[in-house]
A protein has these predicted regions:
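Juxtamembrane intracellular "pre-TM" segments in multi-pass secondary transporters
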Residues: 2-20, 198-235
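Pair of pore-lining "gating" transmembrane helices in MFS-fold secondary transporters
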Residues: 11-43, 117, 226-245, 331
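Hydrophobic core of transmembrane alpha-helices in multi-pass small-molecule transporters
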Residues: 28, 96, 109-125, 325-339
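Short amphipathic helix-loop junctions that connect adjacent transmembrane helices
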Residues: 39-52, 250-267
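Loop-to-transmembrane helix entry/capping segments in MFS-fold secondary transporters
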Residues: 52-53, 140-150, 267, 354-363
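Conserved MFS/SLC helix-loop-helix module at the cytosolic interface between two early adjacent transmembrane helices
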Residues: 66-103
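C-terminal transmembrane bundle of multi-pass solute transporters/carriers
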Residues: 68, 72, 85, 99, ...
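Hydrophobic alpha-helical transmembrane segments
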Residues: 109-120, 145-203, 268-271, 275-283, ...
Length: 396
């Protein structure tokens, strides 16, 4: 009979694990900038084009860029020093984001799309690597706490970053939000550089060629096909992106720019919509984990409950009779989605061997971004091609 693993507290983890603390601080700063950027580019696209399809296209590009790059990111994370990959990803994104300052009118929307593809393509390498390095900088009894804190931080920065990003863009314009996003990457790289990290990935005598990278990237799919229990866990996020989140990306921009217009071009309103989702996603992993602990059975039951809570949120949003009701629906939608997202990741972290961790997380990320692209693309297309109401988009 194996002894039950003790879960450390959040305070113990942050104060006692310097490496995790630096990784976490880098995450806080870069995520804050990311949400500034998303608000800025979404509102800029809506204002320049006035098209739901164009807005949907932005989110399709954001998703597809990560879909293409994330399997290769997983290969790199299993082959090279994960810390260096994270640092260089941040530095490259700093220079790319500054390019958004050049977009001034609708004729340059191609440039906005191109820069978005480059930025999110590198993010598709960064995020699987960040997931893969987490068990390298925490002990086994810290994994559940670290993953919950990481997810809560994402949610908190969604709430705070989206709110502040909306306020900044709505009050002072798009450019300050872009500058803040760019410099957030440099600060993130600084904190990651402070991590004391010894490479745990397996070195190979075979040189890494383009063909071998392509071949290795598909090993994540192969592993999932041979391990059905892992496959179910790894497709939870993709299911959410296809059925819920992809459509809602377009829906929120449409609501803020055409229905509840607050701030310049609806920037402030969009920030509020993202922020309330962030509040829901922030509190739910902590509350749910307080009930379930890190026990596998409890985590699985919570994932099931998360789908029901998500449905409640969508039902509250459906009438679109008031901003308050839409915000309440967004809170519950975020609450349910976060339970599914965080607990499926916790189970994967506990079950995946180190040698395939990067490729499996890369594959998972590819699937969820592809699903998000399909959801966003269909949402924008339905709005423009069929003149679909926002209520019917929620029903879908």
């Amino acid at each position: 009979m194996t002894a039950e693993i003790r879960s450390v507290s959040y305070r113990e983890l942050i104060s006692g694990n310097k490496n995790f603390r630096n990784l976490w601080l880098g995450q806080i700063i870069s995520l804050m900038g990311d949400w500034f950027n998303l608000i800025a580019t979404a509102i800029l696209t809506a204002n320049l084009t006035g098209s739901g399809l164009a807005v949907g296209g932005l989110f399709v590009i954001r998703s597809l860029a990560q879909f293409v790059s994330s399997p290769f990111g997983g290969v790199l994370a299993d082959r090279f020093n994960r810390k260096k990959i994270l640092i260089w990803s941040d530095i490259l994104r700093f220079f790319i984001v500054l390019g958004f300052l050049l977009v001034k009118d609708a004729s340059q929307i191609w440039l906005l799309y191109t820069l978005t593809a480059l930025q999110l393509g590198i993010s598709g390498i960064f995020f699987p690597t960040k997931d893969a390095i987490l068990p390298d900088v925490v002990s086994e009894d810290e994994i559940g706490t670290a993953n919950a804190l990481t997810a809560t931080t994402w949610s908190t920065m969604l709430a705070l970053g989206a709110f502040l990003g909306g306020q900044v863009a709505g009050t002072w314009g798009i450019a300050p939000a872009i500058w803040l996003d760019a410099f957030s990457y440099l600060l993130s790289a600084y904190f990651i550089a402070k991590i004391s990290y010894t490479q745990t990935t397996e070195k190979s005598e075979e040189p890494l060629r383009a063909t071998s990278v392509f071949k290795l990237s598909f090993q994540g799919f192969g592993y999932l096909s041979e391990h059905k229990a892992i496959l179910i866990l790894a497709t939870q996020k993709a299911s959410l992106m296809l059925a819920v989140s992809g459509f809602n990306e377009v829906l929120q921009v449409e609501l803020s720019s055409k229905v509840f217009i607050i701030g310049e071009g609806g920037s402030t309103g969009l920030g509020w919509l993202y922020a309330i989702v962030g509040v829901g996603t922030g509190v739910s992993p902590i509350l749910a984990r307080w009930i379930t602990g890190d026990r596998e059975r409890g985590l699985r039951h919570a994932i099931t409950a998360g789908y029901g809570i998500t449905l409640i949120g969508l039902m509250l949003m459906y009438p679109i009779t008031s901003l308050e009701l839409v915000l309440a629906g967004g809170f519950f939608r975020g609450f349910g989605v976060a339970i599914i997202w965080v607990f499926s990741t916790t189970l994967l972290l506990k079950k995946l061997p180190n040698k395939v961790r990067g490729r499996v997380f890369g594959t998972e990320f590819a699937l969820l971004t592809l699903a998000g692209a399909i959801g966003s693309g269909l949402g924008g297309w339905f709005l423009d091609a069929f003149n679909m109401s926002l209520q019917n988009l929620i029903l879908l």
